[in-house]
Amino acid sequence: MVCYGVTIILVGTLGSLLVGAFPQVTPKKSCSLSKYQFPAPLELKAVWRMKEQFEDIMLLTNRKCNTRLFHRKWDIAELSVPDRITLVEAELDLTITVLTNPTTQRLAETCQQPLAFLTQVQEDLRDCLALEAPSHQPSGKLRHWLQKLKTAKKKETAGCLEASAILHIFQVLNDLRCAAQREDCT
């Protein structure tokens, strides 16, 4: 009887030691951006309201901006899938920064829902890049655009960056749609 009890304890102890000796295979987190091919109408409506309100605010201000960040000589469909994701993540980084620090209180109230949505998108994009292309190096086209963005962030006023990001928000969402379509984006 004592021998049987010791055997059970011994088997239990050895079993737990053996299980701990081998690394556990954790299931890979999947990268699914397909939900962003067609964002929820509620999210799009909130973004549309924010953009319209910003346009109304712009009419009342005297901003003179020449920022042409979102004017590119190439189309996003020309980029590889990791480049597309990197591009949209960078566009969202600027947009989220702008929406986090709006220049008017009126805009601050309207941008909360779009900000939450875009922040979630950015997290999903970063997860995908970390999972699928952790050591990805951007192509020459994208590298040039990223450098242009970095320079603009340093040289442009907050108001001009805000105008550029918000007025081109639907271009960012179209770029997101292309990134979500992966190889099917043409």
UniProtKB/Swiss-Prot annotation:
This is Interferon lambda-3. GO terms for molecular function: cytokine activity; signaling receptor binding. Cytokine which plays a critical role in the antiviral host defense, predominantly in the epithelial tissues. Acts as a ligand for the heterodimeric class II cytokine receptor composed of IL10RB and IFNLR1, and receptor engagement leads to the activation of the JAK/STAT signaling pathway resulting in the expression of IFN-stimulated genes (ISG), which mediate the antiviral state. Residues 1-21 form the signal peptide. The keyword Ribonucleoprotein does not apply. It is found in: Secreted. Keywords: Antiviral defense, Cytokine, Disulfide bond, Secreted, Signal. Gene3D superfamilies: Interferon lambda. The keyword Hydrolase does not apply. InterPro entries: IFN-lambda_sf (IPR038326), INF_lambda (IPR029177). Disulfide bonds join C31-C128, C65-C160, C178-C185. It comes from the Eukaryota. The lineage of its organism: Eukaryota, Metazoa, Chordata, Craniata, Vertebrata. One of its GO terms (biological process) is innate immune response. GO terms for cellular component: extracellular space. Belongs to the lambda interferon family.
